[in-house]
C-alpha cells in the first residue's frame, strides 16, 4: 500500500507536531546568515545549535524541533540535472541536548516514517556506521528491520565530526527504496536510481582529541535531519523533488512566461526550468534575510544565483526581465511558513530587478564575446579571457565554466587567478569590502586569536596589539613600507563598516612606523583595517597607537544622525508605514532607500528638509542606551532590516523625534549637524525610492559648487542668475523649432528619394515589390518614405526599406497594401522576423511596421532575405 499523499506544508507541520508531542519545543527557523562567524551561510539544521553541541552554550530546552531553511552551493552544477540536488532546501530536524539518545531517536524516526507518514516498512532500508554495533542491534532487534536491509558504511558516509577535534559520532540513515522488487541481493544504498536518503540521525557520543583518540562525552546529543523536499517526493509520488508542490508552481510560472509546456519539453529545457525554480527560492530567502548582491562573500553567492537564473531564462526564450514576477509565486508559496518574505516583498523585488537589469546591460555583449571564445577554442578557454568576462561583463567564473562544459571545453583556472592577481596589483584603491581570500584567512585564524574589541564609541585613540597581519589576503608575520595590508588589532577605536556607515579612516603609528588606514571592515568578529605602510616595519605582536581621523568621524556622525532624522521626517510627512530598504552613510554624503509606492512630491521634499533643519536648530540631545531587545521594541524603537541583533541592543534616541536600534556613531546633539540639504529623490526599483542628501560642512561644499555652476552659466548666457530660467526656456523653444524644421526637411528628402525608387519595383505575380536600402535616413523619414512608396505602388504594393542612421544601429520599415495582407502577410510579423538577422526585433500593424537592430553589418543580408521571403510568400 502506498503512503498517503501530503502537501509540503502538511509534511512540515506533521513532522513538527509529532515531535512537539514527544516533548520537543518548536523553534523558528534561524536566518540564512548564521551566528557562526566561520560559516558563510546556514547549511544545515544543526548549525544554529552548534554552540550547544560544542559545549560553548547551555541549551535552554532539552529537546527541540525545527524546520530550518538552508543553502548549499557546493553541488550547484547538479541542480536541475539530478532528482534531488538543490541550492535552497528545508531541513526538518529533532534535537536532543543531553536528554534522550540512540534508542529513542531511532524509535521516534521509525514511528514517524512508518506510522505517521505511513511509508510501508518494506520500502525502507537503513545504514549504520560500520563499527556501531549498538545502532545495528536497535534497528534489527527492537525495530525489526531485516538484517538484509541494514547496511554498514564507513566513516566517510556515516561518521559526523565538527572538525579535526571536538564532539563527533556515528550516523544512521533511513533510505526510501523505489524498487523493492529488486530484492536484497547486492543491496547498494548509494545507488541513486533506486534509493533516496530521507532521514539522517547523528549520534554525538564522543570527543576526539588532537591525537585522534575518542572518549565518551558526558552529555550525549542527537542531531537529525529530514529533507522536506525529498520526503515530499516520496509522499507525493512524483519522479523528482522539482515536481513536488514545493517547487513545481514556480516552474510552471516560469514555463508560462517562456511559453513552454513542461511535460513535453526536451531535457535541456526542463533543466533550465528546474534551475530557475530552485534558484528563485534561494535568492528570495537570501534577500529577505538581508543579503544584497555583490562580488564578495554572501553577496557573491546571491549575484551568482541571480545571474544563473537570467541566463537559463534566456536559454528557454525569455528575453525580458522576469525574476521579480516569478518571485511573487515563490513568496506566495512560502510566506505562510516564512512571513518575513511578505514583509520584505518590495525589497526582494527591488533587489532582483536591480541586479537582473545590471546583468542584462552587459550580458548580450558578454555572450557575444563568449561565443567567439568558444568558437575559437580547441579544448580550453584562456584564463585571461575568462577574467575579462568576469571583470567587464559580470560573468561569474562558474557560469563561464558551466557554459564551456556544455561545449566540451574547460577553463584555465590558473590563468584566471593570475589575471585576478594582476588586476589587484594594478588597483591602488583600498578594498571597499572584505573579499573571500581575506575571509578565508580570517576563518583559519579564528581558532588562534580573539575577536577585536571596539572602543571607538568613547575613544578616538587607543594603544593596541597587532594580532593578525595579511598581505593580499594571505596571513604574514611582517610587512614593510609600500605594502598594502590588512591588519587585525586586539582592540580598536576604528569603526568598521556596518549598518550603512562606512569604516573610519586614520593612522596606526609606532616607533618609526606609519600606516595609513583607508577603510575598516568587520568579518568573522574581527575588525580588519585596510591600509598602506608608509614608513617602517610592521609585525604581528607589535604595539601600535591607533588614531581615527576625527574630522571624517564627525562628518560620518552628522550624516548618520541626519539619516535617522530623515526616516523620522518621511514617516511624519509622507507615510507612517515607510520602512528602510537600505542606506549609505559616507563622510561627504548620505543616501537613504525606503519602501514607498510613489514618488515624494517636491512640496513634501521641501517640508522634509525644513522639518529636519528645524530639529537641528532645536538642538535635541541624543541619548544612547543599551537595553534588552524586548524592551527596545516595547518602546517603539525602529530596527534596521538586515542587521543582526543579540539579546542586548544599542538604542539611539532623539527624544520626541526618533528612536532606532543602531550600532553606528552619532552626534551628541542635533545642533552638531549644522545644516541638511536634499540633493535628489528618485526611484531605484519598483516600490523603492531613494533620497540623496548632504549634511554639515558638505552642505556648504555643495552650495559652493552650485554657485560656481550658476556663475558659469550666467557668463555663458550673458544673463543674471535670476534670468537664467527664462533664457534656457527660450533656447529650448528655439531648438524645438529647429528640430521640427529639420524633421520636415528629412521627410522631404525621403519623399524625393522614394519618388525616384518607384521605377525599381519588381513584379511578383500580380504584386509590386520594392526592397531597398536608403542611406542617411532616420526612422521617421524612413517610415514616411515607405508609406508613400506603398501608396504609389497601389493595393498590391509591398515595400521594405532599411537604413543605418547611426553607427552600429539598423532601422527597418515594412508597408503592405491590402492585397498583400490578404495573402496572409502582416508587416509587423514580417519585419520583426527580418530584424532578428541584425540582432534586433520589432513589429507593428499589419499594414505598417518598424523594427530595429544592433548589427549594421548584417543590413545587406537582412534586405536580401526580405526580398527572397516576399517573393516566396507572394508567389505561393
From Swiss-Prot:
Cofactor: Zn(2+)
Key word tRNA-binding present: yes
Binding note for cofactor: Binds 1 zinc ion per subunit.
BP terms from Gene Ontology: alanyl-tRNA aminoacylation
Pfam families: DHHA1, tRNA-synt_2c, tRNA_SAD
Reactions this protein catalyses: tRNA(Ala) + L-alanine + ATP = L-alanyl-tRNA(Ala) + AMP + diphosphate
Major place of residence: cytoplasm
Paired cysteines (S-S): none
EC number: 6.1.1.7
InterPro entries in UniProt: aa-tRNA-synth_II/BPL/LPL (IPR045864), Ala-tRNA-lgiase_IIc (IPR002318), Ala-tRNA-ligase_IIc_anticod-bd (IPR018162), Ala-tRNA-synth_IIc_core (IPR018165), Ala-tRNA-synth_IIc_N (IPR018164), Ala-tRNA_ligase (IPR050058), Ala_tRNA_ligase_euk/bac (IPR023033), DHHA1_dom (IPR003156)
Subcellular location as annotated: Cytoplasm
One CC-aspect GO term: cytosol
Keywords: Aminoacyl-tRNA synthetase, ATP-binding, Cytoplasm, Ligase, Metal-binding, Nucleotide-binding, Protein biosynthesis, RNA-binding, tRNA-binding, Zinc
Binding, Zn(2+): 560, 564, 662, 666
Family assignment from sequence similarity: Belongs to the class-II aminoacyl-tRNA synthetase family.
Alphabetized PANTHER family for the sequence: ALANINE--TRNA LIGASE, CYTOPLASMIC, ALANYL-TRNA SYNTHETASE
Protein name: Alanine--tRNA ligase
Gene that this polypeptide is encoded by: alaS
Amino acid at each position: 500500500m502506498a503512503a498517503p499523499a501530503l502537501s509540503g506544508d502538511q509534511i512540515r507541520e506533521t513532522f513538527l507536531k509529532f515531535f512537539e508531542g514527544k516533548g520537543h519545543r518548536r523553534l523558528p527557523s534561524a536566518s540564512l546568515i548564521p551566528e557562526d562567524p566561520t560559516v558563510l551561510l546556514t547549511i544545515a539544521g544543526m548549525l544554529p545549535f552548534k554552540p550547544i553541541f560544542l559545549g560553548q552554550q547551555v541549551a535552554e530546552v532539552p529537546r527541540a524541533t525545527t524546520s530550518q531553511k538552508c543553502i548549499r552551493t557546493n553541488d550547484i552544477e547538479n541542480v536541475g540535472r539530478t532528482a534531488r540536488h538543490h541550492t535552497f532546501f528545508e531541513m526538518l530536524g529533532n534535537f536532543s541536548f543531553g536528554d534522550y539518545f540512540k534508542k529513542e531517536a531511532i524509535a521516534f524516526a521509525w514511528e514517524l516514517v512508518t506510522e505517521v507518514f505511513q511509508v510501508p516498512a518494506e520500502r525502507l532500508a537503513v545504514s549504520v556506521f560500520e563499527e556501531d554495533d549498538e545502532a545495528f542491534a536497535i534497528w534489527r532487534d527492537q525495530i525489526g528491520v531485516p538484517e538484509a536491509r541494514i547496511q554498514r558504511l564507513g566513516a566517510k558516509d556515516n561518521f559526523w565530526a565538527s572538525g579535526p577535534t571536538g564532539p563527533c559520532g556515528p550516523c544512521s540513515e533511513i533510505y526510501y527504496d523505489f524498487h523493492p522488487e529488486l530484492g536484497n541481493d547486492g543491496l547498494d544504498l548509494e545507488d541513486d536510481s533506486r534509493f533516496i536518503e530521507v532521514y539522517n540521525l547523528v549520534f554525538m557520543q564522543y570527543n576526539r582529541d588532537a591525537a585522534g583518540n575518542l572518549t565518551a562525552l558526558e552529555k550525549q546529543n542527537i542531531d537529525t535531519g529530514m529533507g522536506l523536499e525529498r520526503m515530499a517526493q516520496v509522499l507525493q509520488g512524483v519522479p523528482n523533488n522539482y515536481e513536488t508542490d514545493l517547487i513545481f508552481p514556480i516552474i510552471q510560472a516560469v514555463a508560462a512566461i517562456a511559453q513552454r509546456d513542461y511535460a513535453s519539453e526536451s531535457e535541456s529545457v526542463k533543466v533550465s526550468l528546474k534551475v530557475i525554480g530552485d534558484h528563485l527560492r534561494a535568492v528570495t530567502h537570501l534577500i529577505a534575510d538581508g543579503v544584497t548582491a555583490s562580488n564578495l562573500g554572501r553577496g557573491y553567492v546571491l549575484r551568482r544565483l541571480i545571474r544563473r537564473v537570467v541566463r537559463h531564462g534566456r536559454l528557454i526564450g525569455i528575453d525580458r526581465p522576469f525574476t521579480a514576477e516569478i518571485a511573487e509565486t515563490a513568496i506566495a508559496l512560502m510566506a505562510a511558513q516564512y512571513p518575513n518574505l511578505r514583509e520584505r516583498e518590495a525589497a526582494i523585488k527591488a533587489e532582483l530587478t536591480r541586479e537582473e537589469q545590471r546583468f542584462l546591460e552587459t550580458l548580450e555583449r558578454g555572450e557575444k564575446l563568449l561565443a567567439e571564445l568558444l568558437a575559437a577554442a580547441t579544448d580550453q578557454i584562456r584564463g585571461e579571457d575568462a577574467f575579462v568576462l568576469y571583470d567587464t561583463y559580470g560573468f561569474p567564473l562558474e557560469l563561464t565554466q558551466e557554459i564551456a562544459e556544455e561545449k566540451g571545453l574547460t577553463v584555465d583556472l590558473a590563468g584566471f587567478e593570475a589575471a585576478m592577481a594582476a588586476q589587484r596589483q594594478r588597483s591602488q584603491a583600498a578594498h571597499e569590502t572584505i573579499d573571500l581570500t581575506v575571509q578565508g584567512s580570517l576563518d583559519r585564524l579564528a581558532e588562534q586569536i580573539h575577536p577585536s574589541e571596539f572602543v571607538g564609541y568613547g575613544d578616538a585613540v587607543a594603544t593596541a596589539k597587532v594580532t593578525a597581519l595579511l598581505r593580499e589576503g594571505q596571513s604574514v608575520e611582517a610587512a614593510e613600507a609600500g605594502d598594502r595590508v590588512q591588519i587585525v588589532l586586539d582592540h580598536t577605536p576604528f569603526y568598521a563598516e556596518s549598518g550603512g556607515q562606512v569604516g573610519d579612516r586614520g593612522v596606526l603609528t609606532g616607533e618609526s612606523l606609519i600606516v595609513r588606514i583607508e577603510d575598516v571592515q568587520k568579518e568573522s568578529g574581527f575588525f580588519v583595517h585596510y591600509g598602506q605602510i608608509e614608513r617602517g616595519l610592521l609585525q604581528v605582536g607589535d604595539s601600535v597607537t591607533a588614531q581615527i581621523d576625527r574630522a571624517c568621524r564627525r562628518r560620518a556622525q552628522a550624516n548618520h544622525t541626519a539619516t535617522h532624522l530623515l526616516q523620522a521626517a518621511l514617516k511624519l510627512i509622507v507615510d507612517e508605514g515607510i520602512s528602510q530598504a537600505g542606506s549609505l552613510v559616507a563622510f561627504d554624503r548620505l543616501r537613504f532607500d525606503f519602501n514607498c509606492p510613489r514618488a515624494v512630491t517636491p512640496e513634501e521634499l521641501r517640508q522634509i528638509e525644513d522639518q529636519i533643519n528645524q530639529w537641528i536648530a532645536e538642538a535635541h540631545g541624543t541619548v544612547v542606551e543599551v537595553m534588552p531587545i524586548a524592551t527596545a521594541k516595547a518602546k517603539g524603537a525602529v530596527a534596521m532590516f538586515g542587521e543582526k541583533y543579540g539579546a542586548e541592543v544599542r538604542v539611539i534616541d532623539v527624544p520626541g523625534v526618533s528612536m532606532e536600534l543602531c550600532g553606528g556613531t552619532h552626534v551628541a546633539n542635533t545642533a552638531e549637524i549644522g545644516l541638511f540639504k536634499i540633493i535628489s529623490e528618485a526611484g531605484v526599483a519598483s516600490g523603492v525610492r531613494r533620497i540623496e542628501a548632504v549634511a554639515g560642512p558638505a552642505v556648504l561644499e555643495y552650495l559652493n559648487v552650485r554657485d560656481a555652476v550658476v556663475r558659469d552659466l550666467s557668463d555663458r548666457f550673458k544673463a543674471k542668475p535670476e534670468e537664467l530660467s527664462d533664457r534656457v526656456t527660450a533656447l529650448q523653444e528655439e531648438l524645438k523649432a529647429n528640430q521640427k524644421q529639420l524633421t520636415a526637411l528629412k521627410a522631404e528628402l525621403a519623399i524625393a528619394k522614394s519618388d525616384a525608387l518607384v521605377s525599381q519595383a519588381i513584379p511578383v505575380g500580380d504584386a509590386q515589390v520594392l526592397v531597398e536600402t536608403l542611406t542617411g535616413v532616420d526612422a521617421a523619414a524612413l517610415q514616411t518614405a515607405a508609406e508613400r512608396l506603398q501608396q504609389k505602388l497601389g493595393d498590391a504594393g509591398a515595400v521594405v526599406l532599411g537604413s543605418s542612421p547611426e553607427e552600429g544601429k539598423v532601422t527597418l520599415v515594412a508597408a503592405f497594401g491590402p492585397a498583400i495582407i490578404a495573402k496572409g502577410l502582416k508587416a509587423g510579423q514580417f519585419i520583426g522576423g527580418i530584424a532578428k538577422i541584425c540582432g534586433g526585433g520589432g513589429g507593428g500593424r499589419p499594414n505598417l511596421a518598424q523594427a530595429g537592430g544592433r548589427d549594421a553589418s548584417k543590413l545587406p543580408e537582412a534586405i536580401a532575405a526580405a526580398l527572397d521571403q516576399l517573393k516566396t510568400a507572394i508567389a505561393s
